[in-house]
């Protein structure tokens, strides 16, 4: 089975919000609600991974610039 392409963070968040809205209505049949919940869990994991990678990038950038001299811009 082909793996679904990874969504960008904003798209992931939007899709999660849409799933939550559908689940909150309480109108979904049980099996469909479970499928939506399963999809939401996967999206949360993707979002967390993206946030962790972003945090790592920020830490690397901060470490690189930790000893840089500050200069005034004209």
From Swiss-Prot:
One of its GO terms (cellular component) is exodeoxyribonuclease VII complex. It is an enzyme of class 3 (hydrolase). The keyword Nuclease applies. The keyword Cytoplasm applies. It catalyses: Exonucleolytic cleavage in either 5'- to 3'- or 3'- to 5'-direction to yield nucleoside 5'-phosphates. NCBIfam families: PRK00977.1-1, PRK00977.1-4, xseB. This is Exodeoxyribonuclease 7 small subunit. It comes from Glaesserella parasuis serovar 5 (strain SH0165). The lineage of its organism: Bacteria, Pseudomonadati, Pseudomonadota, Gammaproteobacteria, Pasteurellales. The gene is xseB.
